[in-house]
């Protein structure tokens, strides 16, 4: 039996997460493995009920679970709070830290039936199937920072630093993932300017001998941003530091036609966190307009990376593909000639395909 902490969160979270849970229940029946789901508060919902974005009991539940499934946190309701107390900061960052999650995995895979939904031309975007491995615990976001008045006027600074050990663990993970895919790794840095990037590049060079079957290329981050829209199918696995990864993964998210299609995993410790890449979308919350597929695909990543159930994960991905191929679309993907469905109906369609497939 696997224990899964379920954190719906805010906005559309309580609508999309149950659909992923139901898909996992269908997997459970299909393969005969039991999942135990335990729900808890996080984010703005936790602030409203408990006065804190990450209650101790939620954190303890996550620690005692085998994996965590998260919906989304945040929204305008809590934007008046001090930045350090807002759901996005006060829930996600400490949760990642406490669980020891140092790597974020963001796949960008374009289903054939969604090629026309991409903002890029068909001939450019066809064949896109990449994953960005982003370092989560170092870099600018966690370095020393300050804003102050000086004799010369107001100034501010942020500090970027990395240890070789931090780089080694994320790079080895990326090599391992590349070895399981198409054996091509692109390491993204800014080694022509940044000292941290030069250490990053040197570390990649030192480690690549451990993975002789993987082809490695180094690419400056500005060039990578250009190549992602010029020829995205050239990429297999991209590994990069925190800030660059944050930007590039959001850029890659538009390739698939909707951010509502993009899952993610944060891994590194004993317990991994799985969540869709999109936010809480409070403007459509409670209206059955949200796309649950990113959350369902995040559940598939859970099966693959936490439970080593690769075949079950592939079955979910294939079920999603068949639903899309039949023309069913949530509002974010809808175009004339397709069949408009709501959140729960889309989840039901995936479950039906999974059970019949």
UniProtKB/Swiss-Prot annotation:
Keyword Cell membrane attributed: no
Any Pfam family the entry gives: Iso_dh
Positions bearing the site annotation: Important for catalysis: 141, 190
InterPro entries the UniProt entry points to: IsoCit/isopropylmalate_DH_CS, IsoPropMal-DH-like_dom, Isopropylmalate_DH
PROSITE patterns: IDH_IMDH (PS00470)
Catalytic activities: (2R,3S)-3-isopropylmalate + NAD(+) = 4-methyl-2-oxopentanoate + CO2 + NADH
Binding site for substrate: 96, 106, 134, 222
Cofactor(s) annotated in UniProt: Mg(2+); Mn(2+)
Subunit structure: Homodimer.
Protein's UniProt name: 3-isopropylmalate dehydrogenase
Annotated organism of origin: Moorella thermoacetica (strain ATCC 39073 / JCM 9320)
